[in-house]
Amino acid sequence: MTKLKDITGKALSGEWGTDDETGVGIPVLRTTNFTNEGIVNYENVVTRIITKKDISEKYLQSGDIIIEKSGGSDKQPVGRVIYFDGPENTYLFNNFTGLLRVRDKNEWFPRYVFYSLFANYKKGGTRPFENKTTGLHNLKTDDYVSRYEITEIPLNKQVAICAQLDQILKVINLRRKEISNLDDLIKPDLSRCLVIRKLIQRDGLKSRFQKN
């Protein structure tokens, strides 16, 4: 077992800057761009004016893992992770999130590290590291990164496992989309059925009164 801190180092803090009134700011990913499937949602990405000079290492690279530091709720713990595979040197991440970047990709496959964190979150592994304040759930990020451990296996096995998991997730997401599309088809029919039912009930009552 290897500690996450030895794989990625401490989580880098995000940037927020100031309002972009000119439309030429830097796109910044927020927790609203997180999905529960670990995929980045690029809808409604905000742009911000960030003037710090030492942010070059914070531009997102392929294989970066973004972890949620603040957010969540009583039903949804803080600590979600998303895997970044978008265009490099384009996006930053905000101050409610942190960046985990694998140091040695010859030893650790970033996708494997992501899946380990993703699975740990799904089983509630971040809850012991929550610090609740008024209306907010904060992740004790440094503590979590220092104590969380990942099973060390050869790189080729890491890649093979991730290929299998990617395929499984692809099938799951496809099924979810099919179910969602089916719901969209069924809802109008259900609405029609309810209208017809009300008409039958109304007309049935009228007929009964007319007979009496």
Language-model-detected regions and their locations in the chain:
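A short beta-sheet element
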Residues: R30, S56-F118, T134
